Every structure is written in C-alpha cells, then in structure tokens.
C-alpha cells in the first residue's frame, strides 16, 4: 500500500544503485495533495524525534 494515500500500491523499480519508489496512480492524478504533504511532514517529524533520542 502507498504510505501516503493509503489506497493504492507503490510502484517499486530496482536499479543498479538501489531502489526507486514511484507514487501510486492516485498520488499522480493531480488531486489535492494537502493531506499527503501533512502526512509527509508527520513522518519527517517522527523520524527527527527518533534521531534526537540518540543526541
């Protein structure tokens, strides 16, 4: 499932240097991205909080 929109699958492409994640068709459709941006900001904040534990 797409972690951003929770409705479609994420397209994963393996390359020589790693893995590339493409957004699902729903994320690319040009819909309002405000909820997606808010979800990304929450994920970044949570990740930074986990990293700050070790400082």
UniProtKB/Swiss-Prot annotation:
This is Uncharacterized protein YkzK. It comes from Bacillus subtilis (strain 168). The gene is ykzK.
